[in-house]
Amino acid sequence: VSRHPSAADFNRFFRGAVFGDYDIFSADSYADFVRRNDIELAAAVTRTAGRKTIGALAFGVRGRRAWFGLIGVDPKHRREGVARAMMDDAIAAVHARGVTHIELEISQRNAPTLAFAQGFGFEQRGELMVWARRARAGKVTALPMRRLREQAIAAIAQAPAACWQREPRSVALAMRFAHLDVPGAYAFVRTDDGFANVLDAGATDAASAAALLRALDMHVPQDLTLNNEPADSPLSRALGDAGWRVVERQYQMVHTL
């Protein structure tokens, strides 16, 4: 059964011991997440009980790759086989479209979901960290916001993206953001009032990573996050040294069809 799952649906699905008891999406942030990551809500796999949606799996497709970006089941209907049925249907759906490679991320605090994904043939490819720092006081020089095309972003990054959400296409679809560049490192940053998010960043070594973080402090005073940075990268090591905190640790999972 398919229908368009909403922000309210996923906010309800994600409540519990792993995700907490607060809404993870607003209507605007949900729409932005869906658009930037090519999530096809019309193709989402859902399950209902009566008139109520009790589970949904929404995915994006880029060529022969798919990303299972949103998977959730109503807490009242867990352990009823809902997630298993949706996963079966979603894998079959993307396979029918020629997809040969599926990606997803799983919180390391969510051991049952890790075992669940492994049961479908997903294997761990890496470890991704969600980093954050508090707002910085003092005078800063704001960076100009601009638009860049996907090809220009790829030319700046010059390396495979850490994950689906940080691919050049996802960054370009953010529409307006700042580009920060230092020798050997770069960052694309989107700001919104008192909060900022690094859409993507990279550094070739420890020195360039440290220089990039100093530049971020000079130009981005807001609370700042960087999602899904590989745990073993020069940037992750520099973030730890600079006092950023780890908000989440995730397993990066892949499945080849």
Give a label for each model feature.
Residues 11, 15-58, 157-179:
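Active-site rim helix/loop that mediates acceptor-substrate recognition in acyltransferases
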Residues 46, 52-60, 67-72, 183-191, ...:
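Conserved beta-strand in the GNAT
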Residues 73, 79-92, 96, 115-119, ...:
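Conserved acetyl-CoA-binding loop-helix of GNAT-fold acetyltransferases
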Residues 80, 84, 108-126, 230-248:
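Conserved active-site alpha-helix within GNAT-family acetyltransferase domains
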Residues 94-106, 128, 220-230:
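Conserved GNAT acetyl-CoA-binding A-motif
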Residues 103-107, 123-136, 245-256:
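Conserved catalytic-core motifs of GNAT/GCN5-like acyltransferases
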Residues 179-257:
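Charged, low-complexity intrinsically disordered regulatory/assembly segments
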